[in-house]
Amino acid sequence: MGWSPRWKVMLRGIFNAMISIHILLSLLFAHIATAQSGRSFGDSHGHSLNKRAPLAPDGDGICYTYTIQEGDTCAKLAQRYQVTTSNIETWNVGSWGWPGCAKIKQGDFVCLSSGALPMPVALPNAVCGPQVPGTRRPIKYSDLASLNPCPSTQCCAISGQCGTLSNFCDVSPLGSCIFNCGPKSTTKSAASKTTTTSNPTTTSKTTITSKPTTTSKPTTISKTTKAVMVTLTSIQMVPPPDKTTASVAPTATWQITIYEKGGCKGDYYSAQGHEDQIVGGCIVLADNTDTKISDTTTSCRWWSDGGLNWGTCASSKLVNARSFFIKSGKCVIYSGKKCQNEDWVGETYGAFKGCQDGNTGYLSPRKDAKWGSLQCFEYKSYTT
């Protein structure tokens, strides 16, 4: 019995389909076999995890720094990155707050290669020590504890806070106090107190006095007999007073951290500078790209991912801040970009009040206000 042309076509189609299925199954089994043998089938670099190249320090010589995630252990990291737990212990000896592999905790930094030790993770509310946001790396890593010191009468605790009680000043348990430790006297010297007349005592918009003028004698500086009140927006940028002049106090530093969430939580701006009530500058958050921190510059950084990464303030989209923490100085907030009176939305209160938001009652700018620009300064006294 002969096959009709129709049946021949159908049989040929079935045969071709079986061949295609056979080829696909062969490829699948080959892929599984190579994956199980440790050879990556689809790796663009031709290497599997088991053949990972050794990690190396970055361009600045800092070790390859990894952020501990939930569930991480040194053993798991050693297996994942083809090193040993002994390597990890050795590479991290002397690192800030390193507890050893047995006590690593989520959020900490750990070296997974040789190289210089990294700066510790920034703590949003820290006011002393190396974990104050924006702190620069010292020349000597051993100087970390002395960075951002507290006033001479206070101790700096591992939490980044200043105080005089035992939980700030005692070195037991180990690590409670990191700098200027030991009992502190509560008696304050009258000579150490300074007073100024320029600090406003009301909650109205801030006004400041003009810069003191000098007399005809070059060796003395006298105050003007009549203070001329001006608004912050009328200040012209002028160089700060010469620090070598004995009759002028050193330039003070202001610093503020502005958060996207209440309670000083979430991503944040960190701004600091050296302006006083006479030398005023306008920081436009959406445009600012000045990130250099020094004894003379004004900087503004945007910290994301819980303070692990930073960029320029211009890289942030935050316009409705919910809380802030001011370390020192005072800031006036404007909705626009020109720091002008008609855009005024509020100003900060003293640093002693800690984290300030709508719940504490200390957040002067209303919750729905747009933070477009800042004008910050530290009050400075001029003595004769």
UniProtKB/Swiss-Prot annotation:
The keyword tRNA processing does not apply. The lineage of its organism: Eukaryota, Fungi, Dikarya, Ascomycota, Pezizomycotina. Belongs to the secreted LysM effector family. Secreted LysM effector that might have a role in sequestration of chitin oligosaccharides (breakdown products of fungal cell walls that are released during invasion and act as triggers of host immunity) to dampen host defense. Residues 1-35 form the signal peptide. GO terms for cellular component: extracellular region. In plants, chitin acts as a microbe-associated molecular pattern (MAMP) that is recognized by lysin motif (LysM)-containing plant cell surface-localized pattern recognition receptors (PRRs) that activate a plethora of downstream immune responses. This is Secreted LysM effector LysM14. Keywords: Chitin-binding, Secreted, Signal, Virulence. The LysM (lysin motif) domains are small globular domains involved in binding chitin in eukaryotes. LysM14 contains one LysM domain. Residues 185-220 are annotated as: Disordered. GO terms for molecular function: chitin binding. It comes from Penicillium expansum (Blue mold rot fungus). It is found in: Secreted.
